[in-house]
Amino acid sequence: MQISLTVLLCLATGIVSWQALSNSELFSKLSLSPYRVKHNKEIYRIWSHTLVHADMGHLFFNLFALFSFGRAVEHYMPTALFALLYLGAAAFATLPALKKHGDNIYYTSVGASGAVSAVMMLYMFMFPTSELLFFFILP
């Protein structure tokens, strides 16, 4: 049995976020800092910010959405393409912050919402007639 990339992303994000929420140094090191990307060439932050979340609610909703939609999307495309989509969307989502806050030493952001939103949008394009239930009961 092969574990899916979606499950691996959820596990990695959950573990790293859990650790970072109690370790401010790790949280700071992984957060997106457009200033540090631009001036210190810390390019890794374009992707590392997807592994940390502001709080447990933020983490839960991103992981819930990624797990719910990601498994279906990944099932119908090669794993490498799904990985490229996720990483590409994460990078693309940072562009406005990089442009607007590249010289602001105080601005930081965290979370995988940009990448998760891309997975959700792709799900909607792939399965346009799929019925989504809110809170598992409301269509």
Which stretches of residues belong to each language-model region?
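A detector for small-residue-rich transmembrane helices and their helix-helix packing motifs
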Residues: 1-139
